[in-house]
């Protein structure tokens, strides 16, 4: 598969699994008083860029979460993000994130070539593509990273510690299993990729 095809499948997978959020998701960022939005929880400059692609989005750009909430506009922002134009903008930006940020990071992992495994890792990249890259690089010599089940087990049992967020360990274990179930069942035959045989 080409990088573009992998990026597109990664973007589609992030949307279909909902591991980062729904199209219309709006919450307060854990990093400050600004909105975290959409199916990839964009915030800050990336969030403002997303809003710039949607008619009416400029009204929300640069505003704090509390300002939007206190003015009673959270549902309006959610509706904007969930609109057809909002969904199209998110898919475009997500595909671009996968191609421009996540694929180059994963490309630095030696001997990491299996298409399903790359798609699996892409679905973790929104947590931090640099942490995912280092996580895989640090395990490259000791584990077969071209084995989807091995990747699932590594992310389920070691990623929360490696990412220094043990409080998410249970959620990450669930995410690891959900992503595995999604990626293992993908029909990638159009790209010449065989069915997963686990």
Question: What label would you give each PLM region?
Answer:
Residues 1-108, 115-118, 122-198:
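Cell-wall polysaccharide-cleaving catalytic domain and substrate-binding groove, primarily
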């Amino acid at each position: 598969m080409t990088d573009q095809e992998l990026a597109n499948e990664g973007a589609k997978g992030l949307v279909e699994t909902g591991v980062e959020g729904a199209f219309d998701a709006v919450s307060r960022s854990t990093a400050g008083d600004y909105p975290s939005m959409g199916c990839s929880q964009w915030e800050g400059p990336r969030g403002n860029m997303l809003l710039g692609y949607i008619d009416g989005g400029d009204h929300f750009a640069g505003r704090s979460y509390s300002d939007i909430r206190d003015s009673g506009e959270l549902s309006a922002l959610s509706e904007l993000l969930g609109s057809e134009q909002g969904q199209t903008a998110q898919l475009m930006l997500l595909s671009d994130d996968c191609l421009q940020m996540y694929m180059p990071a994963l490309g630095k992992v030696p001997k990491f070539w299996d298409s399903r495994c790359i798609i699996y890792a892409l679905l973790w990249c929104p947590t931090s593509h640099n942490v995912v890259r280092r996580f895989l690089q640090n395990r490259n010599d000791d584990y077969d990273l071209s084995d989807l089940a091995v990747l699932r087990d590594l992310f389920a049992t070691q990623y929360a510690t490696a990412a220094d967020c043990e409080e998410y360990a249970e959620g990450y274990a669930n995410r690891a299993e959900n992503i595995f179930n999604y990626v293992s069942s993908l029909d990638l035959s159009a790209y010449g990729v065989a069915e997963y045989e686990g």
